[in-house]
Curated annotation (Swiss-Prot):
This is Adenylyl-sulfate kinase. GO terms for biological process: hydrogen sulfide biosynthetic process; sulfate assimilation. Pathway: Sulfur metabolism; hydrogen sulfide biosynthesis; sulfite from sulfate: step 2/3. Catalyzes the synthesis of activated sulfate. Its EC number is 2.7.1.25. ATP binds at residues 35-42. Coiled coil: none annotated. GO terms for molecular function: adenylylsulfate kinase activity; ATP binding. HAMAP family: Adenylyl_sulf_kinase. Keywords: ATP-binding, Kinase, Nucleotide-binding, Phosphoprotein, Transferase. The gene is cysC. It is an enzyme of class 2 (transferase). It comes from Salmonella gallinarum (strain 287/91 / NCTC 13346).
Length: 201
């Protein structure tokens, strides 16, 4: 479909975002976790989602590996495919936030420009960039999927942090130390969500 196809018209709906948020009892936002492979993005995002669920908050977690089973199954790992992967995820996350959910996304998303595009699509007031900052050496020690080992051996090309660049956020809304306990990081994030009046409990 062309970007500006004259036959495609955006339809407004009688149920507004504000009405959906009122029903859920909290705001709809996107929590965008970014960091190297093995930094703890998925672990922290999953623990935060569990904590929010226990508090009656409506959530959904979009994980980098999981979306490639369906939504992005046709994409590889070239620069163009990675950009399209993040674009699709950003679109889905934006729709879910419109539905009043707190959407957690765990993606390396190595390029600032791509993260900025998602932020603009979602809306600056509904997008929270969370940088899980974990030293490369620690990520390599963890190496939960054995990817760093393959990259170091030359068996895996264009791997972020080894032979492909990761552009750390210049000024993320949240900067987490990935070497801290997950429980501490979740507490920090819950406090942030309360301070910003995103959740009440």
């Amino acid at each position: 479909m062309a970007l500006h196809d004259e036959n495609v018209v955006w339809h407004s709906h009688p149920v507004t975002v504000a009405a959906r948020e009122q029903l859920h009892g909290h705001r709809g936002v996107v929590l965008w976790f970014t960091g190297l492979s093995g930094s703890g993005k998925s672990t922290v995002a999953g623990a935060l989602e569990e904590a929010l669920h226990q508090r009656g908050v409506s959530t959904y977690l979009l994980d980098g590996d999981n979306v490639r089973y369906g939504l992005c199954r046709d994409l590889g790992f070239s620069d163009a495919d990675r950009q399209e992967n993040i674009r699709r995820v950003g679109e889905v996350a934006s729709l879910m936030a419109d539905a009043g959910l707190i959407v957690l996304t765990a993606f390396i998303s190595p390029h600032r420009a791509e993260r900025q595009l998602v932020k603009e699509r979602v809306g600056h007031d509904r997008f929270i960039e969370i940088y899980v900052n974990t030293p490369l050496a620690i990520c390599e020690q963890r190496d939960p999927k054995g990817l760093y080992k393959k990259a170091r051996a030359g068996e895996l090309r264009n791997f972020t942090g080894i032979d492909a660049i990761y552009e750390a956020p210049d000024s993320p809304q949240v900067h987490l130390n990935g070497e801290q306990l997950v429980t501490n990081l979740v507490s920090q994030l819950l406090d942030l969500l309360r301070r910003r009046d995103i959740i009440r409990s």
